[in-house]
Amino acid sequence: DTSYNHGQSVSDMNIWRKKAWATVPALDETKIPALVASVKAAGIYVTPTNYFFFSSFADSIGADTYRNRPDFAYIPSKIKEERWKVREAYWKKAPPLASRNKYKDIRQKMTYALWKAGVPLMAGSDSPEWFLVQGFSIHDELATFVSAGISPYHALESATKNPLTYLG
């Protein structure tokens, strides 16, 4: 598949590739304003899915934390077993903490910059990926918007008004 460069950079397509994490130090947040301007000029709606990327690849969430989440009970046992093996394999040798933190920081800054510029954001969670359960995971996604600096009111718009506007 030549649609993206396997292992060349940390992007949504390559984040699960360990070698790609070596590119995080090269991420340049000074490029965010130009990217935001291009997105705004194109009239694009953006669905960051930050919680999926953070919880799956950037945050080392322990087994007890996962198992104590209220949504964990709604994941079928067979899926839990399969996904747990994949997750454990990924986290056996985690990317460096500094890289994971920088990745999260830049995504949060970009999310905030997009919102501040008036780019319509839409909340999405990529549920049912990994351990994301419909309903619960959208609340987690909204929390990432608020932690990025977006007001709770505007975070809620990303799950209500903005998708309505997008769909017409």
Put a short name on every predicted segment.
Residues 131, 165-166:
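Short, solvent-exposed loop/turn segments at secondary-structure junctions
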Residues 3-144, 148:
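Active-site neighborhoods of metal-dependent hydrolases
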